[in-house]
Amino acid sequence: MKIAVFVSGGGTNLQAIIDKIASGEITNVEISEVIASNESAFAIERAKKAGIPAKVISKKILGAEAYDEATLTELNSIGVELVVLAGFLSMLGPKTVAAYANRIINIHPALIPSFCGQGMYGIRPHEAVLAKGVKVSGATVHFVNEHYDEGPIILQKAVDVLPDDTPETLQKRIMKECEQVILPQAIQLIADGRIEVVNNLVRVKP
């Protein structure tokens, strides 16, 4: 299964996918291209080091409509079967989302439907978790639709919020123990044909 991975920053989750493909933990999956939202994303260097083509498509430079067209054209040209948003801080355009319905997944660093939506990215969900005093947090892999963090939920994993946690320690633990576990799992489930969406709910087939 050919996938494209969209990134905006350091590419830690991208690296986890690269490593698990290399180790054989993820099978029958090939990263055809890494697409970054900006030229300064370190994820581009990770892609190059792994021999994966990388490209920058910037909504800021192109404008929303041209960005949507450029993204859709690029995905179609490389024959992508699944789009993976891994620390991608922009929103895909409506044409792209419609053309790849139930073929775009995102990793969110909280347990949707809590601490999600527009503006909830990076360190912010973890700050909000600690400010609210909740006792567990985690990560969610979900399909992408036209609204922020509202697509059908595929997988979730939780960790305890510790009394001495800071936003940074919580972010690091969730990334390692949740995000880098369930994002590769979701990719493998989709590659194996085990995910179906019925009435906007995800069912994992045995």
Protein language model features and the residues they cover:
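One-carbon transfer enzymes
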Residues: M1-P206
